[in-house]
Amino acid sequence: MAAAAGAPPPGPPQPPPPPPPEESSDSEPEAEPGSPQKLIRKVSTSGQIRQKTILKEGMLTKQNNSFQRSKRRYFKLRGRTLYYAKTAKSIIFDEVDLTDASVAESSTKNVNNSFTVITPCRKLILCADNRKEMEDWIAALKTVQNKEHFEPTQYSMDHFSGMHNWYACSHARPTYCNVCREVLSGVTSHGLSCEVCKFKAHKRCAVRATSNCKWTTLASIGKDIIEDEDGIAMPHQWLEGNLPVSAKCIVCDKTCGSVLRLQDWRCLWCKAMVHTSCKESLVMKCPLGLCKVSVIPPTALNSIDSDGFWKATCPPSCTSPLLVFVNSKSGDNQGVKFLRRFKQLLNPAQVFDLMNGGPHLGLRLFQKFDTFRILVCGGDGSVGWVLSEIDSLNLHKQCQLGVLPLGTGNDLARVLGWGSACDDDTQLPQILAKLERASTKMLDRWSVMAYETKLPRQASSSTVTEDFSEDSEVQQILFYEDSVAAHLSKILTSDQHSVVISSAKVLCETVKDFVARVGKAYEKTTESSQESEVMAKKCSVLKEKLDSLLKTLDDESQASSSLSNPPPTIAEEAEDGDGSGNICSSTGDHLVGSACPSRPQIFRPREQLMLRANSLKKAIRQIIEHTEKAVDEQNAQTQEQQGFVLGLSESEKKDLKTDNRVCTSSVHSESCVIAKGRSQRKASRAPCEKLVSKGLSLGSSASLPPGTGSRDSLPALNTKILYPSVRAGMSGSLPGGSVISRLLINADPFNAEPENLEYYTEKCVMNNYFGIGLDAKISLDFNNKRDEHPEKCRSRTKNMMWYGVLGTKELLHRTYRNLEQKVLLECDGRPIPLPSLQGIAVLNIPSYAGGTNFWGGTKEDDTFAAPSFDDKILEVVAVFGSMQMAVSRVIKLQHHRIAQCRTVKISILGDEGVPVQVDGEAWIQPPGYIRIVHKNRAQTLTRDRAFENTLKSWEDKQKCELSRPPSFSLHPEILSEEEATQMDQFGQAAGGLIHSIREIAQSHRAMEQELAHAVNASSKAMERVYGKPRTAEGLNCSFVLEMVNNIRALRSETELLLAGKMALQLDPPQKERLGAALIEMDQQLRKLTDTPWLCQPLEPGEEESLQQNVMLDLTKRSRSGKFRLVTKFKKEKNNKNKEVHSNLGGPVHLWGTEEVAAWLEHLSLCEYKDIFTRHDIRGSELLHLERRDLKDLGVTKVGHMKRILCGIKELSRSSPAAEA
């Protein structure tokens, strides 16, 4: 390297050259033109470095001069020296002196996390593994430039340092260095720019730039602070030069700035731009610009608390400041762009990068404010992160949260009205304005609680011919109960005689096989004759129960054939311990009225059928329990086979035994399943289907298990469950209402679960949606793919493509096609029979997986309420496959709805975990229980488009009313003798018009009503001018101008009235008198055009309207049945031209130089006013100007030339002189 540098190292002798394995061969000189070319290589030994305090160290990638060449090196920072070598254990380290060094970010599209260390002799380009590590290195390097001792706590306080935050960039126009005032080199003006204040500098000049970046605190303002009777205020903070092309001075309204030199000024806060000469004329106090409502002024940050965090006081002008969190990794790393833009618009101290320290520092800064707003720029994960930190600081009552969508899904941003994506950082001022007008809405947040334990796996089929793979005979016996439950369900729910007969046959075979299996297992496990007798008695009882059931089934069949109408729905009521009880309850009375006393006789055998079925199941249960007891005594391995059973305390057993269900509450009751035959039932739509879907949701006591936790403390809710809604994969409707539901829910598989939520751990908080199964599997695969290959998932489009690829893969593999066998679902304490599905989604907002309305609608119907994210109600839907998820993006499907409820409980069965996702973050959840309960509510900022439109209309109206500028020619105070004579003639004509109107009004009340206000105003104005004796000084011009305006308005309203139905009501003599008065009035108005200060009240095209309208016959005009259809665009265009011309006055060909100059000002071309005035360009010359004439006058810009020519064309169309 020394040879490459061309000079031996001077000074004291250096250590001997290191051996080749330890040589740092990658320290080539890298310097820009104009910097010293001599590189003095300095090295140190590891022993010398070991004696010094290391401030920061780690591996970085160092780029060399050669193309695409980089090497990993280990760097150590000590004081103002940076050391690097191949490894941390190397003997020889290269040195980089940081005494006159500067550091700048140089990432390519904010992706490779690179930064440049610039010294007088070299340029060192380094790359970190992630953005946070890069910013940590930059902060450390910037700090050691001024301080010998680096304090680690200052990492998070970088906002308040006052130093510039450099990044390398190019510019599209000539740009000048704010240090040396010379132009930046290269065609693209490549150099360094401060990401906050846009201070420009050469790389060699950056180290000499003063630390005068945008103020953040009161101390940073310094002596420039303004103190008055109202307290302290902030002055303008000026930055010189590099103004945009369209810059105009706020004082003189003339063009400022230059591309030839560094001149004129721009305020970093209010964005005002002024000439150097006009700077002193501007008010010193800064108004903070258009975003002043959102800005927290530096004067509000004036102290530090005991923990080292800045504290913000609340000045009167800052009632609801904005705290901004930006995820710099979101949106293909476009978050960096938004981070810089927000720092330019607001106080840099109120803008934070979530990837560098998280949201804690910002929330601590703002926690003293009574109210403040938060804007999260990122995806749904970023929003959840900030809300979780708000939970920990308990700030929900103080803050309101808005979302700027930068992520992939952005479901919450869609629901709140902020759109699906935001890529243009130039629209941030408009977005901040919309955020100030946003309304507040509450967002429900839900705790996802988990209790991990092993639960038994459900049977995969309801037939006896299953190929059991269990090793234990007793475990196989347990499945017989499932089969019995399934066939009993078929017998009770099916309306088809063939299905009932088939199920009865299979049921008989199942029971026989069950008895044989029990006997075989019992012989193997016990030799006691007494035990054998007990088991024989139990089997005998089982046979009796089966015979009784078949007999009752036969009676019910005969009763059904005698009636043509199907049975009505029976209301739910709890049964006693024997399975008997009064089926018609108070809730049932409310549902079906007086149907119970007069119900058909068919219900007595149906009730008996239900009781026999329950008794049969209990007999099977007793046999199973007895068998297990014997096995437990003889076989020690039974504990392993039944390891999924949860032990219950005695008090829990007693509580469960009092639960009015058919199934007993033994410790093995988890094996009682919910309708194993549900997927085999045929669809049969009974007339009672609607009552089944709604009657079961009316909150009867029998449908909810006791001790459902927080449900009792919540307001009463009619839990809405629609079983037929999932008929795409299950049986359809469930005839027999409460009877069937009682059988389907006769076993409580959750009775071993601890009811107290203290035993649960909160996995996360759900804001958007929860998914288990298929959608969670896709999200998990995508997250793994993104972790493995982050370069493949850097844009929103690529991410959506990956989701599509992974979804198509699941369409073929169907990994969770039997999810209903792995999970059990319970809504508000009521177990839900599941169809054959691949996933379950629990929705809090009506946007799922990137904008899909998976609920299938936003309106209320007969069964379900309208979905909302502020009603403390969740929507539960079934996921049948990838194709359904894809179609749901186009068509609003509703057949997969399951329920609306306040709490959701999911049991994961078996030994394997199942993918689970919350708001797009997925993981594998081990077997156990998951409960979703309401946690709290957060205030969110919702875009109110109706209010925005109303406000915009009002603002436009105000602009139109205030857009008329003052007169361009100041009128004199007193009229001259010639003008006074002319006004006398004008007054006589006006008096004649008023007299004619009053005569006609005596016989036509309609005219009096229409013109009374205009006549009275004109009369008062004339009385003010002519009513008093004329003084020697003459008439007052202000009074005369008011009179002319009022009389002109009277003439216009009279013209409009005569153009309508009034002309049909007037007599011919009256029309003639009024027409003559109008003609005389119009002639006097034309004469006023010669008086400059009186020409303003005349509308544009006045001459044209007088010549056309007054000379027409009033009768023909009023009776004309033709209407001119003018397009809206043309009307608006004409109205705009009229507004401009009315401000200028008179026909265009009569304009003077002052009117032409005013017309140029209306075109925003004030820079040409002096040129046109010097060349004496009047209205008549203006109408005939062409492109070559404008070039001769000095108009060289093509855009300005086009604007002038278009304006002349419009003037020519409306000018009568041009037409002549």
From Swiss-Prot:
Keywords, comma-separated and alphabetical: ATP-binding, Cell membrane, Coated pit, Coiled coil, Cytoplasm, Endocytosis, Kinase, Lipid metabolism, Membrane, Metal-binding, Nucleotide-binding, Phosphoprotein, Protein transport, Repeat, Transferase, Transport, Zinc, Zinc-finger
Pfam families documented for this protein: C1_1 (PF00130), DAGK_acc (PF00609), DAGK_cat (PF00781), DGKD_4H (PF22944), PH (PF00169), SAM_2 (PF07647)
Entry's localization field: Cell membrane; Membrane, Clathrin-coated pit; Cytoplasm
Keyword hit for Zinc-finger: yes
Disruption phenotype annotation: Homozygous knockout of dgkd is lethal. Fetuses are smaller and newborn mice develop respiratory difficulty and die within 24 hours after birth. They show an abnormal open-eyelids phenotype which is associated with significant reduction of the expression of the EGF receptor/EGFR in the basal layer of the epidermis.
DAGKc domain: residues covered: 317-451
Annotated region described as Disordered, given as residue ranges: 1-47, 554-584
Protein known as: Diacylglycerol kinase delta
Ranges for region Regulates association with membranes: 1-52
Pathway: Lipid metabolism; glycerolipid metabolism
Free-text domain note: The SAM domain mediates homooligomerization.
GO BP term, pick one: diacylglycerol catabolic process
Domain spans labelled PH: 53-146
Membrane topology category: Peripheral membrane protein
Complex formation: Homooligomer. Monomer. Interacts with AP2A2; regulates clathrin-dependent endocytosis.
Residue spans, zinc finger Phorbol-ester/DAG-type: 163-213, 235-286
Gene Ontology CC entries for this record: clathrin-coated pit; cytoplasmic vesicle; cytosol; plasma membrane
Function description: Diacylglycerol kinase that converts diacylglycerol/DAG into phosphatidic acid/phosphatidate/PA and regulates the respective levels of these two bioactive lipids. Thereby, acts as a central switch between the signaling pathways activated by these second messengers with different cellular targets and opposite effects in numerous biological processes. By controlling the levels of diacylglycerol, regulates for instance the PKC and EGF receptor signaling pathways and plays a crucial role during development. May also regulate clathrin-dependent endocytosis.
Family in the record: Belongs to the eukaryotic diacylglycerol kinase family.
